[in-house]
């Protein structure tokens, strides 16, 4: 049965919720340094791009459920609408997962990244799962993001904004609504908050109660992340020791040793100056969460009106993005997102028309507020060199302020000889290099990267200094959706990017 329920949110529905929403004191945020205010490969088609709008889009009055008047793609059909309604009402009564003040703080920092004064590091699982939910996995992903951020911060000499694809990245769009194996055709797996990945009829039926479980898992993940961020686990000295260990045990350690030891020397100087491990600046960090805004009933149920500003915030995450398949100008997802005040991402591939991008940005950010829009580009190295410059010029010509981000994962999915999906580290590195090259040619700021990655020692992407081959893929291939960089590959990529940032910085200083 298709989604058609109507919802209304009220800040007075729960005494606990009311207290949380109207508390003017923001909860402690999750910068290590104080951030400024200022075999043959068989290509796989990664996406079916959104079709350009055929007519001019008229923007009517926005409301929490005005998206229901638009065409909604990629949403599941639940068999029992009343059961879904009951679950959504429960979610409405639950406390928000994040707070408006935190989202505003992230927007300010993303505005700095748009001007080249900060670097955005966004990473995490392709799709979070119920089965792999445990403290160690959360800790390991958080840890590798910390390690990467220190390397990038030293290379660029700018604050690093750390945003996880965590605590809500469950739902996944699919190019085909059905999957067929051995003549049996069932609905595709769309993420653990919708249905199960086991290939049987019962598992593939969308279950609204999975939304409650996803909410609870997100809340627990956020709780642990806050503890890690503020409880001493993020201490700079500790993170640097981890990086030195990586360098010493890497086959290409000599390549990164100089940078790692320079970071260690800088910390020694700071300690001598009084910034020891006990100082809050050295032991805590900021951290935010993000996910794709796909399952609109869930996102609506967690949207709250901020009493201090009168604006609506999607309190399921600090930042949400619209995907390549759901970014139609006259579609339901764009309609929902134009009314929430969170920082927003827009995923674009080589199929994005520059004029369409300008229109989309104008719909989502009519006030042209810095930090509001992040354009996440994913198109492969060759397309990046040909197509990106047209997008950059169009956006600049329209006077729009955006934060440009490189997603080198989705445009590089291939099929290995064994049949598993994988991504080659060399291709990922090539797309990052192309992203930097184009922005340097255009005089814009390439200070951001978006990765599907994990802190685990998986074998899902081939290559890297600790080489993963096609033959290795089956040994630790644990992803529920797309292949992820493992911890070693992720950190290696951060050293490569840091080297590029340092060269760019040194070159600009000589001018």
From Swiss-Prot:
GO MF annotation list: 3-deoxy-7-phosphoheptulonate synthase activity
Associated pathway: Metabolic intermediate biosynthesis; chorismate biosynthesis; chorismate from D-erythrose 4-phosphate and phosphoenolpyruvate: step 1/7
InterPro entries named among the record's database cross-references: Aldolase_TIM (IPR013785), DAHP_synth_2 (IPR002480)
Transit peptide endpoints, chain numbering: 1-49
Localisation per UniProt entry: Plastid, Chloroplast
SUPFAM superfamilies per the UniProt record, alphabetical: Aldolase
One biological process term in Gene Ontology: chorismate biosynthetic process
Tissue expression pattern: Higher levels seen in the cotyledons than in the leaves and flowers. Lower levels seen in the roots and stems.
GO cellular component: chloroplast
Name the UniProt record assigns to this protein: Phospho-2-dehydro-3-deoxyheptonate aldolase 1, chloroplastic
